[in-house]
Amino acid sequence: MTLEQTPAPARTDVRRPASASGTTTTTRPYYKRGMLLTAGALAWAVGMSIVGSDPSGATEEAVFSTVSGLFQIGVLGLLTVLYQSQALGEGRLARFFLRLEAVVLMFAIGSTFVDGIGVSDLDKAGWMMLDLCWPLSMMGMFFIGIRIAIAGRWRGASRFWPVVAESWAVVSVPSYGLFGSTVAGFVGAAHLCVGYAVLGQIVARKQS
């Protein structure tokens, strides 16, 4: 008597795990926020190239406020990425500083909005204090960039490029005093393209 054993046919309706099939899924959790930062930086750069860094008249002010406001929203998105990824560190002080920067930036966005609709009055102390939130927020981002580099939690270009991007205030503001609003507008626009626009792409491609 002969016994013949026939193996069961392989099932074809079961999907193999990604590791077994040799394929992996790329996750980019910060993609949308990175692209928003790039779009905002480029929009503000274009607006600054057209109207300069010191707009005059209702139309120029409205255009400038719109594009700079888009940039500010992009930076606000960047702050959420930094908070989520603990880019400054895991301690309470790092979280507090990011929250404080977000509050100052939201006041700066409010300042941009009221400038755009033409209701601000810089001759009054309250409006002046609100207007100061804009440069203060940018200086805060500069210190955040330094802290990211020191903490070393982000790797590669993402560790050091924030310092480049967030040095916008320390580069562009002095150029306004030295060369006037026209030259400062082009300096600021170029810095936005090299700094924040590129940083947005780096953030968009981060996988963790």
Task: Label each PLM-derived region with a short phrase.
Residues 2-208:
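Hydrophobic, aromatic-enriched alpha-helical segments typical of multi-pass transmembrane helices
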